[in-house]
């Protein structure tokens, strides 16, 4: 099974997991459409992977997201949502607006993508959401993100029933060595990498390419829906 002749939309496709998924999907014959906030970064990503098109907008802007899908000229087979990310802040240091934004970038974004993409998606196509294992591994700096990611498995299962025959699956990732991780950790990045190499059962850090391989697998296997797939190198067991 491959993606020959299919259209894959990457919501958050200019770097990291989204970009790697675009590269892998294009290699399997898909037409890829990249979205992100920065037109400059999208242009570089498009040249890298040979994207069919790019569109710059903020995916958390519901109206812009809806217009994006409405303006697509052709049907879509698969959508991967990687926009959004963790916020390393204790809950008591966050304002109510900070908390709303963090929750929105996880649960609400996935729902709005599903709502906007549904009219353009082919039956049997798939929506792949990104979450994490934080709901099972509590960190005092990730309380809100942990709460949001813990809600995503039942959210995904219910959405799969509502969207059927469009399939919906969730990738629950641990630490992934992405540009976003580098930006969030700053000077602590190398120490974090070294720690994971020493402690993870796989003996190395999970890469964007690892997650991209899983994302494409969820797209091409038509029997998979409503499920959550962990990819953390065994991090949750240590």
For each feature predicted by the language model, list its residue ranges.
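Conserved glycine-rich cofactor-binding loop
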Residues: 14-15
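C-terminal substrate-recognition "lid" of short-chain dehydrogenase/reductases
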Residues: 204-231, 236
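Catalytic loop of short-chain dehydrogenase/reductase
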Residues: 102-103, 111, 126-164, 175-176
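Rossmann-fold cofactor-recognition segment
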Residues: 48-63
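A glycine/serine/threonine-rich, flexible loop-to-helix segment
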Residues: 176-199
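Substrate-binding pocket helix/loop in short-chain dehydrogenase/reductase
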Residues: 90-91, 98-103, 192, 196
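Conserved Rossmann-fold SDR core element
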Residues: 153, 162-177, 224-231
């Amino acid at each position: 099974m491959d993606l020959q002749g299919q259209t894959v939309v990457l919501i958050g496709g200019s770097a990291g997991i989204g970009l790697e998924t675009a590269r892998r999907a294009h290699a399997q014959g898909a037409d890829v459409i990249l979205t992100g906030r920065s037109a400059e970064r999208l242009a570089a990503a498009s040249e890298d992977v040979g994207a069919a098109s790019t569109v710059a907008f903020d995916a958390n802007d519901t109206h812009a997201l809806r217009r994006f899908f409405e303006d697509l000229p052709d049907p879509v087979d698969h959508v991967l949502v990687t926009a959004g990310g963790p916020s390393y802040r204790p809950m008591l240091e966050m304002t109510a607006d900070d908390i709303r934004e963090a929750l929105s970038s996880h649960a609400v974004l996935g729902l709005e993508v599903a709502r906007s993409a549904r009219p353009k998606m082919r039956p049997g196509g798939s929506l792949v959401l990104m979450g994490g294992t934080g709901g099972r591994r509590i960190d005092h700096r990730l309380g809100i993100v942990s709460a949001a990611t813990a809600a995503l498995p039942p959210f995904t299962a219910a959405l799969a029933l509502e969207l059927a025959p469009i399939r919906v699956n969730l990738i629950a990732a641990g630490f992934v060595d992405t540009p976003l991780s580098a930006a969030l950790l700053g000077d602590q990045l190398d120490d974090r990498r070294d720690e994971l190499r020493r402690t993870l059962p796989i003996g190395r850090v999970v890469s964007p390419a690892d997650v991209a391989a899983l994302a494409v697998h969820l797209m091409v296997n038509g029997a998979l829906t409503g499920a959550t797939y962990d990819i953390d190198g065994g991090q949750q067991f240590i």
